Amino acid sequence: MKKINNNKIFVLFLTILLYLLNITTAQKPVSINIKIFDQLPLYNDNFGSQSRAATIKSMVATSLNTTFKTPSLGSATSSLPSPQLFQYWFQSNFANETKNSGLNAPLTRTITLNYDSDSGNYIFNNPNFFLIDTDGFDKTASNRIYKDSTGTYHNYHYCVAFNYVFKPDGQGKEMFKFTGNDDVWVFVNNKLLLDGGGVRSPEATTVDFTKAGLVKSQETPLDFFYCERSTNSPPSFKIETNLGGLYCKAYDYCGVCNGDGGTCCNPQTDCLTQLENGTLINDKCTIPICPPLDTQIDKNLGIGFFCQHSQIPDPYAGSLCEKGECDSLTGIWTRNTSICPTDKDLAPQCRKQATCDPKLGCQSTYLCNNVCDIGTCNNGTCTQKTSNDCVQELDRGVEDKCFTYKCVPNVGCSKTPICPRGTDPCKNYTCSGGICGTVDIPQSECSCPCPGLNKCNTRICNPDNTCTLFNLTEINDGNPCTDDLCDPVTGDITHVMTTRCSGCNTCDVKTGKCVAQDSHCDDGNPCTDNACVASANSTANSQVGQCTQTPTAKCDLGDKCMVYSCTLEGGCNATQRVCPNSGACKIGYCEPGFGCKLKDRVCSSDWYCIEAQCDAKYGCIQFDRRCAPDNSKCQEGVCVNNTAIGKNDGKCISEDYDPKPFVCQKAALVSTAVIASVVVVGAVVLGAAIFAGKKGYDAWKTSQGNVMAASQANPLYTQSSNGGENPLYNSPT
């Protein structure tokens, strides 16, 4: 067996002593899941080989966007080549691969903050914070163009964010310090408390928690944002904090804390197919969308199965006279103006196409508005007025047997005597009950000279042998809406519809007055209200009617919780109003008589130690209740469910760390007894190590049971992580 060097024995003893002391003070490390957004200067020229300068304040707004948990751009933007692209520093953007499109590559990593017993803080320190070399955009070898001073390639351009929460212990000693180069912002309670924007050299900055408005045991968000934008020096990244109780409340389906799904779902590549009737198809007329963040993804089906697809907006929308049609295979839109039915389509309805109004839609002309039409259509044929209709119209339904009734096209109903008038001026031609007759007129009454006598009138001789002329009674057809005419040479009688009423006005055969006929304005569109109104061209002797069409109001029945609509094909429709939500935590509902309102989304948990909240991004979430201890250095908060009383009953308690951390023990207890016991144990271990080597140490450790449960490895036989020499790494022989 080799001789043991005294120096090595001393180092061994010291190592054991320090290690055992560390056992009593060790705390669990804090793991933080970070979001990384790889940036390429081609797509976002705010990143590149920029010169370092002083810290820039007010690059971001002082309040955090509480829905997306991202900072908003502030007032100091002059140093940014493209301020509009700031929105893509900390959220996924799957844009086109074009200059300054804002395209980024979302990634995720986990960093571990180890407990430092000297300071009582948790620390992560990496002076060469190159976490995503050959990842993100740099998976493509041609993008690996940035190198450090030694010529070694690195991925320099990226942003980091994490959104965690903690519960203050009420001691007022919270601390969070960051040391690094380029941009860093930290928000506490959604307030900007660390403002370090700009491409700059590494410097230490500390959060001022006195401005955070902390309340003991109250859930408090801490949101961290960092960017490495230059290649002038390696990215330095160090976090030091005493917030050992940092935790994440919600993870997306990619497993990222407060993620947006971007690390495992790119809609341009993962959502190209959709489910239709049980078959996955690729429809280029839809916009692929990654699943909602609260979706439970079945890994056997793949994320694409849960993607959503919304229709690409019709580029020709806005006019009721045209629409776009999209080819699902090519995604190419074509314009279709064949919206309205053709004359052939309308013929069975006795209509013909008139025009199309972009706001009102298709309009047609009704062909059964002639004066001899009764206004109904029978399979494409207008129903004509019969003689009975004319009796009703002219004589209120009482037929005069001495006349024939008929409707003359473009003239209307008229009646003519059934008994013809003869040429003998000394006979009076009569009709009674439909029977024609004559009555002789004395010569003295019919043979007098009568200048102006023609075939359209008759005469009566006066005692002084003069005559009086009268128009033939049959000239008047009894219709006040016709102009009655008689040819004085031939005696032919004609009746012409009056021109006093025109347009959509018609003449009332009972009164002779012009009446507006709204039915004559029917455009065949159930979604318009049609009216006949007086035209500006009307005069006292000529009443001109003009048709107007307006969007119909007859569909709206006044119920504020119904949505009324109208279609050319179906007319009026009514559907239940769906009130939109406002974000993930405000639920829309409809209150009768009022309309849409919002109410808080209610999230519940059956157990006290499982908290339920509504998150503005995820909706209802559940997570373990974290309890703030009375003294975070010496105690941990523990949640206890009281199942004996009920599921929702429980409490938070503070329990001392066991074993109690060295700094928390009373001086009197820590002095001689503790040190002595440590020395004794150390001596035992030292002896085991010297005389039995590694196996002796391991056997001793096993015999101690739970006493050494906190030990993670044998410190004597673990190679130093920093390259230094472990004096007893090799077993003595």
UniProtKB/Swiss-Prot annotation:
It is found in: Membrane. Residues 27-672 are extracellular. Residues 114-260 form the PA14 domain. One of its GO terms (biological process) is sexual reproduction. Keywords: Glycoprotein, Membrane, Signal, Transmembrane, Transmembrane helix. The chain crosses the membrane at residues 673-693. One of its GO terms (cellular component) is extracellular region. It comes from the Eukaryota. PANTHER family: PROTEIN PSIA-RELATED, PROTEIN PSIB-RELATED-RELATED. Belongs to the prespore-cell-inducing factor family. This is Protein psiM. It comes from Dictyostelium discoideum (Social amoeba).
